[in-house]
């Protein structure tokens, strides 16, 4: 079983690709009502994005509740460039036999503009090649630690992550323009259930996971985050992969 948590689809796509290549099943943890039984699994995998150089809280909480059978355990984190100590920290919650980081298209539109179409296609093509190798290593139960931690990994995974969780998860800067048609896509897609509709317009709870699905997947590009996101490209992986690879 391969468990995943995803925002704009990068980690979902990676999990599904690995499931296909290894003959396994990919499962979105946000759809699970109960902690699954993995005692009979031959392999247990985790795929998730890097949030401020750590695994998302929702994924670490989920993993900490899972049983730890004799299955081969692996983790893949998707990131824009560096992973910091993400996998080492995650392995404290669920010990891993193999750990990987995989560069995928940028989606943190709050911090910087998303990648161009050309860069997106290049990153996805590189990821496809890397996933072939990762799948073979998993199938052969090879113990691998191929994580690009980057510079000052410890500082980033401690101080930057602390700052992110303390200050950056606020939803106050979110707002919608008059392009909003009240479709509710943002509310349906929010894994934290932090968005609800009031008078046909989205409203946010005080904090969220900063998964960026709402702002990137809004069909009318009506959602903004302060002034920083106006005019920036939106990104979801579905627009850049074949139909058969989409959710």
Segments the model singles out, each with a brief description of its role:
Residues 150-183, 187-191:
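A mid-sequence, solvent-exposed acidic-amphipathic segment
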Residues 175-176, 181-203, 207-209, 213-230:
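Iron-sulfur cluster-binding cysteine motifs and their immediate structural context
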Residues 113-114, 211, 239-243:
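Short low-complexity, flexible loop/linker segments enriched in glycine and/or proline
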Residues 75-76, 171-172, 199:
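A short, structure-level motif marking secondary-structure boundaries and short turns
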